Amino acid sequence: MNLIQRPRRLRISSGIRDLVRETELSPRDLVYPIFVVPGVHIKEEIPSMPGCFHYSVDQVALLAREIAERGIPAVEVFGLPEYKDEIGSSAWDMTSPVQRAIAAIKEAVPELIVIGDVCLCQYTSHGHCGELHGRYVDNDATLPHLVQTAVSQVRAGADIVAPSDMMDGRVAAIRSGLDAEGFVNTSIMSYAVKYASGYYGPFRDAADSVPSFGDRRQYQMDPANVREALKEAALDMDEGADIIMVKPALAYLDVVRQVYEATDRPISVYNVSAEYSMVKAAAANGWIDEQRIVLETLTSMKRAGAKIIISYHAMDAAAWLNV
């Protein structure tokens, strides 16, 4: 058979496959999310997210060192507060676990990039992402609270703030608020394209942020829409976002690619809790090769255009990649 083109020639050995590989996953692509809680000497596994834990602030310095040793450049900090109220005021309380954890991480590992999650759902008594007017989340009344939260996290030492609330205009408000406080070099990683997804279930258990009524479809995006994603990304860029996020990641790789092609900003994705937990459950039952599935999944996100991948698999993935 006279075949001039034989694509298998470039697959014939591991060395040649490595030589022509188009997408190379690295620990430097990853961000590890951590959950901090009130109390001391706490490291408790989250039941719906095997391998992920709640940490008290006194435990995060050791964790930060382990993360850095694996070559992961950044963490994103989420927290459960000591108290909740109607407006989520513990979100900007400098004595809350998130602010204290940020400070502890920066003291222990100054070179580790710390991202602060800016939202109110963990902090409000009703579990929604903003201040309520009746049963409606009041967009404009919420913005000052988000600004206060972002500023408090940066005062604690955060390098990047990541508004995940999906209120209109929050990037501009936060940018203005940070600049007014002199934090002109603090980056904003906007959850610009955040869908009202069923893939968040385990996270809401981990963060104790299930809404007490209704859902978040009034402010998070319809999973059926992609043109809206491009609009949201463009609006947040115009408002000053430095990094654009798509969340979730795996079911939205088509969206990731289109946003990547439409913008000159770095793209981040969030490999969310149910994506993680489904893999862990299948692996626990012996149905899949966990390492192979995880690395293939993360590579698909980078191949689609993501420069930054926030993933609960990050610690394991980094260990596998470093072998």
Predicted feature residues:
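N-terminal amphipathic/basic leader segments beginning at the initiator methionine
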Residues: M1-R21
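Alpha/beta enzyme core
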Residues: N2, S13, L25-V31, V37-V323
